[in-house]
């Protein structure tokens, strides 16, 4: 057996290397040797602390050579720290870290390295047991390298939005994971990624801090400056995120001791002398801190609630004679999702502690019940099957009496059960310039509609007033109609159903035209538009919405007014203006899909109204009210329901016959008066899709039960990753579980995109696999 190099010999070697390179030894490295010698003399584990942020370029070569010697020395472990700005660039720091990889124990890296560094680390892996990373400039986490010894992973205070398809796939021993104060918000992709961790026991996206409200000095005491410092030690001044506290409050069992309920696991560590990383890696600091704070509260030395934490993020529960107040701190956005805690407990059966609250059997029972009542595991209540099994059953016709529609639903469920992240891709024509006389011109969509009969076509209108018919399967432009000269944004589009080559386009300046796309140009051009093949109607000032009836005889227009105009398509004339139909302007007007006389209007006056052209226009059939202004309304494909979307995620389904509430989808609001929500149907009447302009999430819910099937997070490119939001969306009328989303960016320099979403395919699907199951509806389907 080879003799291990002693620490004193290593130190001498380092000094000699420095002399060879003509530099003075680094004092931080000499201190590390001294500390290691002290530990050795006390018969403690010989651990060296290496502070890379104190290493300068002159120190680099001697240290790199020394690290190669450490692997064969009596040093038992290396704890590597970068706590402040590091002078070493990525391509210097990475070889240094890898040179001691065999003995790495703890790696703590903070705000120092770029994307290339992290991509290399996460792809190649490390042999450390603890990895603590902060201020990392990566939005999509994709740790696929071998981290076979990793026990604790701390990712707090990073701008992580989501996870790659194979993230966490090589971490067999990971037991503790913390992702507080990140941007993670998606329950579905997060749970799918975390399921790849077979040993995960403790997880946190937030910290529940307990303090007592039983102090006699609740309202009268004024804390000293030292007390304020103590508070800030445990609760940072960041504004808290509204957490799913009611789930937590309901599951707190007052019969249990406090210690069994509040598991004070803190991942901010202080490495112990013994190698007990397999029990708890340095949790003493946080545990003692919370106990100390609780004792101060009970003795009246602290106010019962810190001033920088909103009471919305607290709940109180009695334990005997003591009332404990729990405060959410450092919460990631995922914590504000409704039933977040119950969803995670149900999805991660091996988890023992979530957000430092212990999970008991009663919690799991409640989680199963909550999940069943509020979520769909697979569409159409199907059980998980393989695609091969479903296809075999269809070929054998083993299930008597089953229709083709039943097999199709089973196949959809089987396909949706496979990918964690659905296939998303932007229509390709937006990724490059359209060659025009003006070389800087690009088509920027503002509204779009699927063709009623041709599954490959959609029309979109641009910010500059152009109308473009696109083959969205090939990405090629089929027809192009330039702006009529005013360059006013197209806000209203509607295909005719009986005459499917005709499309109505309405502009923000009030212009209304009917185009025959067969007579339009097949190439993009800036030449003046020929009026042949188009019909011009009387203008409707500040137009926002147009829609034709089921017989293609009439269409309606609404805008920033209280009025609605009725037009005769065949004659090209305006028949009537219905005045003062609402108290505020009318956002959307929609005809019924089957009746040529019924139509609905939605307004910011909080009302949705149903009208009948055969009756007096001053009196609606009924009025249904929301608590906020209505952004839009649409009929279900069979006209049984009205889907009303109000500001900030208030989505309700009404019975068309009398306006009674059928379902409230109970989507969590963002508490924003500018969060305009839009919702449409998908898969006929089966599901609804909903998105809002302040969020990058599309929610998919069952239209019959209101249960959430899943959320889809939009992903921008590069720095825009988390800056996309939903401007409009439509379910694909020909493909089950497919949709398109008009997604805009917060930055004015970035153009909008039309993003196609396929819930049945994963993001690494081939082109052949990405096509959805087609279900050709009747031509009467509108909206």
UniProtKB/Swiss-Prot annotation:
| One GO CC term, this protein | nucleus
Supply the Pfam families for this chain: DHU1_N (PF20919), WD40 (PF00400)
Q: What is its main location?
A: nucleus
List the SUPFAM superfamilies.
L domain-like, WD40 repeat-like
Q: Which GO terms describe its biological process?
A: cellular response to UV-B; response to UV-B
Cellular localisation: Nucleus
Q: Where is this motif: Nuclear localization signal?
A: 382-389
Keywords on this record? Nucleus, Repeat, WD repeat
Any phenotype upon disruption? Hypersensitivity to ultraviolet-B (UV-B) illumination leading to short hypocotyls under UV-B; the sensitivity to UV-B is alleviated by the disruption of UVR8 and requires the presence of COP1 and HY5. The double mutants dhu1-1 cop1-6 and dhu1-1 hy5-215 phenotypes resemble that of single mutants cop1-6 and hy5-215, respectively. The UV-B responsiveness of the double mutant dhu1-1 rup1-1 is similar to that of the single mutants dhu1-1 and rup1-1.
What are the ranges of the WD repeats?
145-198, 212-256, 439-480, 485-525, 538-577, 581-621, 625-664, 666-710
Question: What turns on expression?
Answer: Accumulates in response to ultraviolet-B (UV-B) illumination.
Assembly information from the UniProt record: Interacts directly with DDB1A. Binds to COP1 and RUP1.
PANTHER family hit by this protein: BNAC09G30780D PROTEIN, PROTEIN DWD HYPERSENSITIVE TO UV-B 1
Q: What does this protein do?
A: May act as a substrate receptor of a CUL4-RING E3 ubiquitin-protein ligase (CRL4) complex involved in the negative regulation of cellular responses to ultraviolet-B (UV-B) illumination, likely in coordination with RUP1. Interacts with COP1 and probably prevents the formation of active UVR8-COP1 complex, thus avoiding UVR8-COP1-mediated positive regulation of UV-B responses.
Name-wise, this protein is Protein DWD HYPERSENSITIVE TO UV-B 1
Q: Origin organism of this chain?
A: Arabidopsis thaliana (Mouse-ear cress)
């Amino acid at each position: 057996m080879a003799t291990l190099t002693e620490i004193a010999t290593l130190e001498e070697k380092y000094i000699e290397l420095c002399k060879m390179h003509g530099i003075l030894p680094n004092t931080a490295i000499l201190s590390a040797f001294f500390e290691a010698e002290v530990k050795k003399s006390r018969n403690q584990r010989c651990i060296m602390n290496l502070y890379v942020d104190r290493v300068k370029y002159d120190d680099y070569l001697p240290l790199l050579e020394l690290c190669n010697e450490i692997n064969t020395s009596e040093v038992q472990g290396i704890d590597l720290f970068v706590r402040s700005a590091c002078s070493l660039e990525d391509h210097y720091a990475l070889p240094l870290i890898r040179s001691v990889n065999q003995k790495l124990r703890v790696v703590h890296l903070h705000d120092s390295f770029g994307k290339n560094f992290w991509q290399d680390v996460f792809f190649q892996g490390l042999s450390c047991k603890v990895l603590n990373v902060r201020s990392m400039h990566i939005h999509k986490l994709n740790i696929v390298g071998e981290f076979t010894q990793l026990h604790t992973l701390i990712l707090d205070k990073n701008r992580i939005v989501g996870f790659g398809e194979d993230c966490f796939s090589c971490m067999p021993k990971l037991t503790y994971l913390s992702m507080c104060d990140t941007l993670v918000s998606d329950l579905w992709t997060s749970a799918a990624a975390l399921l790849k961790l077979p040993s995960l026991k403790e997880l946190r996206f937030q910290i529940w801090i307990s303090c007592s409200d039983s102090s006699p000095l609740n309202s009268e005491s004024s804390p000293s400056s030292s007390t304020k410092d103590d508070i800030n030690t445990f609760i940072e001044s960041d504004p808290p995120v509204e957490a799913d506290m009611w789930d937590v409050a309901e599951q707190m069992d007052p019969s249990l001791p406090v210690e069994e309920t509040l598991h004070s696991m803190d991942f901010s560590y202080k490495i112990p002398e013994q190698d007990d990383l397999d029990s708890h890696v340095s949790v003493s600091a946080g545990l003692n801190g919370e106990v100390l704070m609780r004792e101060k509260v009970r003795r009246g030395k602290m106010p019962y609630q810190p001033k920088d934490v909103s009471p919305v993020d607290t709940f109180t529960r009695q334990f005997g004679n003591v009332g404990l107040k729990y405060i959410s701190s450092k919460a990631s956005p995922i914590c504000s999702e409704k039933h977040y805690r119950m969803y995670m407990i149900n999805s991660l059966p091996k988890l023992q502690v979530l957000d430092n609250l212990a999970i008991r059997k009663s919690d799991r029972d409640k989680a199963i019940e909550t999940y069943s009542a509020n979520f769909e595991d697979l569409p159409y209540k199907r059980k998980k099957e393989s695609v091969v099994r479903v296809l075999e059953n269809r070929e054998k016709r083993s299930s008597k009496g089953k229709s083709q529609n039943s097999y199709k639903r089973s196949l959809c469920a089987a396909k949706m059960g496979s990918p964690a992240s659905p296939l998303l891709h932007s229509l390709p024509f937006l990724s490059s310039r359209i060659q025009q006389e003006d070389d800087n011109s690009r088509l920027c969509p503002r509204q779009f509609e699927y063709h009623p009969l041709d599954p490959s076509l959609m029309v979109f209108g641009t910010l500059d007033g152009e109308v473009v018919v696109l083959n969205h399967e090939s990405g090629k432009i089929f027809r192009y109609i330039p702006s009529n000269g005013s360059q006013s944004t197209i806000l209203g589009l509607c295909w005719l159903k009986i005459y499917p080559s005709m499309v109505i386009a309405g502009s923000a300046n009030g212009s209304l035209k009917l185009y025959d796309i067969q007579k339009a140009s097949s190439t993009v051009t800036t030449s003046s538009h020929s009026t042949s093949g188009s019909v011009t109607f009387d203008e409707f000032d500040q137009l926002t919405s147009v829609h034709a009836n089921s017989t293609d005889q009439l269409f309606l227009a609404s805008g920033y007014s209280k009025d609605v105009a009725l037009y005769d398509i065949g004659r090209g004339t305006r028949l009537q203006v219905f005045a003062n139909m609402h108290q505020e302007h009318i956002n959307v007007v929609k005809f019924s899909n089957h009746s040529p006389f019924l139509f609905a209007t939605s307004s910011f006056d909080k009302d949705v109204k149903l009208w009948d052209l055969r009756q007096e226009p001053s009196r609606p059939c009924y009025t249904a009210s929301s608590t906020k202004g209505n952004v839009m309304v649409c009929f279900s494909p069979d006209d049984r329901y009205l889907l009303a979307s109000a500001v900030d995620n208030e989505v309700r389904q009404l019975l068309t016959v009398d306006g009674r509430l059928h379902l409230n989808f109970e989507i969590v609001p963002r508490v924003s008066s500018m969060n305009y929500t839009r919702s449409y149907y998908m898969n006929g009447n089966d599901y609804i899709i909903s998105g809002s302009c302040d969020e990058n999430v599309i929610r998919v819910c069952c239209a019959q039960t209101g249960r959430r099937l899943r959320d889809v997070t939009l992903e921008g490119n590069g720095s825009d990753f988390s800056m996309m939001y939903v401007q409009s969306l439509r379910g694909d009328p020909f493909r089950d579980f497919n949709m398109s989303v008009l997604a805009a960016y917060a930055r004015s320099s970035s153009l909008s995109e039309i993003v196609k979403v396929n819930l049945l395919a994963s993001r690494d699907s081939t082109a052949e696999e990405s096509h959805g199951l087609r279900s050709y509806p009747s031509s009467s389907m509108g909206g």
